[in-house]
Amino acid sequence: MKELNTQEFDTHVLENEGIVLVDFSATWCGPCKMQKPILEELESEVDFDIYSVDVDRSPELAGRYNVNAVPSMMLFKKGTLKNTLVGFQAKEVILEEVEKLK
């Protein structure tokens, strides 16, 4: 799962014509550590892009999207934010939310 910085975010997320999941997380966050393997597993199974943003390394992105808790997963479609999932999420929940965007 590729970690994006501010410069890469616009290209990989906002200019993407498909569905993109962005996981805003932090290295010190326990639930984030539990979420990461689920997202890595999903990445090999799905037809949409999954990226991560470290809120400590990219605080401007966290601020831009008002990330107040981690993990926060944001779903974008054609560059527009469509949904935010806050806290640890089961794989099935993530897939259900993505299906709603198709």
Named regions from a protein language model:
Residues 2-19, 59:
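A short beta-strand-turn-helix
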Residues 12, 61-64, 97:
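CheY-like receiver
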Residues 2, 51, 82-85:
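Structural signal for short hydrophobic segments within the conserved structured cores
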Residues 34, 44, 78:
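Short, conserved catalytic or interaction motifs in soluble domains
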Residues 65-74:
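Structural micro-motif
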Residues 77-102:
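Non-catalytic, surface beta->alpha helical segment in thiol-disulfide oxidoreductase systems
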Residues 24-38:
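Conserved redox-active cysteine motifs that mediate thiol-disulfide chemistry
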Residues 4, 24, 39, 43, ...:
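Thiol-based oxidoreductase modules, predominantly thioredoxin-like and allied folds used
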